[in-house]
Amino acid sequence: MFYLLGLRLLKYITFRMAYATIFAFLLSLIVGPYIILKLKKLRADQILREDGPKRHLSEKAGIPTMGGILIFFCVFISLVFWSNILNVYFLIMVFVMLGFAFLGFIDDFLKIKKKTSDGLKARFKIYGQIIFSFFSVGILYYFGGEHVSVIYFPFIKSFQIDLGLFYIPFGMFILISASNSFNLTDGLDGLAIGLSIVITGALIIIAYLTSRADFAAYLHIPNIKGSEELVIFLGALLGGSFGFLWFNAYPAKIMMGDTGSLALGAILGMAALILKSEILFSILAGVFIIETMSVIIQVLVYKKTKKRVFKMAPLHHHFEELGWSEMQVVIRFWIIGLIFAIIALSTIKIR
C-alpha cells in the first residue's frame, strides 16, 4: 500500500525490507497472546504421537497448535503495507503461502476434531500439494522470463541445464519435498522455525544480489528483474518468524502445526525457484534433508530387517533418546543449519 504512494524513500529495497521485518515482528508480539488465548479457548491443542518420546506426552500436552495462523497473518498484513502488491513474484508467493497454509489448516483441524494424530489422509494431502505446486510453478514458468527453466550450478560458472517444460515437474518436486521436510522437522520447540529463520536470512541476501544488475554481473549470477519484491516478502517472513519464535521458544506456548510447517517449506522452496537457487537451496535446507532421510532410512531398513537404524525417527528424536535435552538438540541443529547457510552463500562467489 505504502509502495503505491510513490514516495521516493519507498523505492529503496533495504528500507522497505527493514520495516516489513520490524512491522511483522511487532505485530506478532501484539496479536500473539490474543491468538494463543483464542486457540486455547477453542481447545485447539497439539495432538501428540503415541509413538513419540514419552516425556512429550506430559510436557507438551495442552499446547495450542495452528500457530501458522499467527505467522502468516502478521506476514500478510506487513506485505500489504510494504510490498508492491502488483508484482508477479509477490502474487506467486502469496498464492503459495495461502494455498499450503490452507492445506495445513485442514490437516490440523481434522486432527483436533478427531483427537488423533491422523488428520488429512496422506493421499489427499499429496493431491492438494500437487495442485497448489502445479499452478504456482506453472505461473512462474509462464511469467518468469526466458531463463526461468535454466538450472545454475554452484562452483561452475558456465555449466547450466535448461529443463524446458520439465522444469514444471522439477519445481513441483522441490515445493512438495520442502513442504513435507519442514513438516517432519517440526517436532521440538523452536527447531523448525529457527532453521527457517536461517534459510530466510540467506535467501534475503540472495534475493538482494539477484535484484541488482551490478552485483549479479560481478558474481556471475542471474539478474532477475522484479526479484526485489522477494526481499520484502522474505523480510516480512523473517519478522513474522522471529515473532512466532518469541512464543514457540522452549517451553513453547504455541506450536506452528501443519498450518505453519507445510506452508513454510513451500514458501522457501518457491523463493529458491524464483531466485534460480534450486541447487543452493538443497544446501541451505541440509538439516531438513537429513531429517527426512533419517525417516526414509528407518522405514526401509525396518521393513526389510525388522531392525531400527535410529532409536527413533526423525533424527531429532534419536538424539533425545540418547539423552540430549530438547534445547541441546534445537540449538545444535540451529548451529548446523547456520553452517549449511554459510557454505551455500560462500558458493555464490566461487564460480
UniProtKB/Swiss-Prot annotation:
It comes from the Bacteria. One of its GO terms (molecular function) is UDP-N-acetylmuramoyl-L-alanyl-D-glutamyl-meso-2,6-diaminopimelyl-D-alanyl-D-alanine:undecaprenyl-phosphate transferase activity. It is found in: Cell inner membrane. Keywords: Cell cycle, Cell division, Cell inner membrane, Cell membrane, Cell shape, Cell wall biogenesis/degradation, Magnesium, Membrane, Metal-binding, Peptidoglycan synthesis, Transferase, Transmembrane, Transmembrane helix. It is a multi-pass membrane protein. Its main location: membrane. Its EC number is 2.7.8.13. It catalyses: UDP-N-acetyl-alpha-D-muramoyl-L-alanyl-gamma-D-glutamyl-meso-2,6-diaminopimeloyl-D-alanyl-D-alanine + di-trans,octa-cis-undecaprenyl phosphate = di-trans,octa-cis-undecaprenyl diphospho-N-acetyl-alpha-D-muramoyl-L-alanyl-D-glutamyl-meso-2,6-diaminopimeloyl-D-alanyl-D-alanine + UMP. GO terms for cellular component: plasma membrane. Pfam families: Glycos_transf_4, MraY_sig1. Belongs to the glycosyltransferase 4 family. MraY subfamily. This is Phospho-N-acetylmuramoyl-pentapeptide-transferase. It comes from Borreliella burgdorferi (strain ATCC 35210 / DSM 4680 / CIP 102532 / B31). The lineage of its organism: Bacteria, Pseudomonadati, Spirochaetota, Spirochaetia, Spirochaetales.
